Amino acid sequence: MKIKKATAMCAVLSGIMFGGAMTVSIPASASSKDQVTIYLTRHGETTGNVMQRVQGSSDFPLTKNGIEVANDLGYGLKGIRFKHAYTGNLTRQEVTAQHVLKYSNNKGTKVTTTPKLREGGYGSFEGDSIAADNQKIANVYGYQDGKEFQQATGKDYWNKLQDAYYKLDSENSQNTNLAKSDRAESAKQVQKRMSSELLHIAKTTQKQGGGNVLVVSSGMSINEYLSTMTNKYEGKPMQNAAVTKLVYKNGKFKVQGPIGTLHYVNKGQKIVADK
């Protein structure tokens, strides 16, 4: 399946007075050392991924491969000190973070869980076969099938997919008795909570002097968030344990490097292979 905003740096003025150099430092609310770098990461492979199920807010555990890729990511991130780690409150996200921290030598780093970082909710469709739902989703927008829908919508695919679940569940197309609060989320709802939480994390870390933060979330929610905050976003599927670096500086987030890179996983796999 196919995700935009940090403080002013000290200004330094240099002048010439009476033939000599004079440097005047003007303090600001934060300096360059207060920069925050968030390693926004998708969880490792789950049983739901393998079975091609709609996961959302439902709890599917990591597979053996999912644990191994989380370990590989950890090895690939060795040398990076994480001041804090945050995850959604789903087992697949929490366990991924634990393994990444362990194998990157950050085992003592505190982990905070929050529902704001969980996957997009799909309400009555949770646990469904993705293949079985594809036709229903495509029909919402007048497409023949899921493949045509994805090709036609391009980088908007993930948001439209989320909104299709929201529309269908709002209409109770599955004929369930779910409460409104348990039904599918819209893309805007996912984007709002992701954006709010990531900004909170960045500001909190900045007040503590800046540094690196590991954040583990899920593919759809990451894609939906990134689609709102950078023109680098292309809507490509977010692979398991893929990382997107977000730098928070001068009051804004900026994507640093590629979106959804497997660089750290590949680096970790090489380290393991060379042991």
Q: Where do the language-model regions lie?
A:
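Solvent-exposed, polar/charged alpha-helical surfaces in well-ordered, non-transmembrane soluble domains
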Residues: K64-N71, Y75, E94-Q98, K188, ...
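Short glycine/proline- and acidic residue-enriched helix-loop micro-motifs
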Residues: Y141-Q189
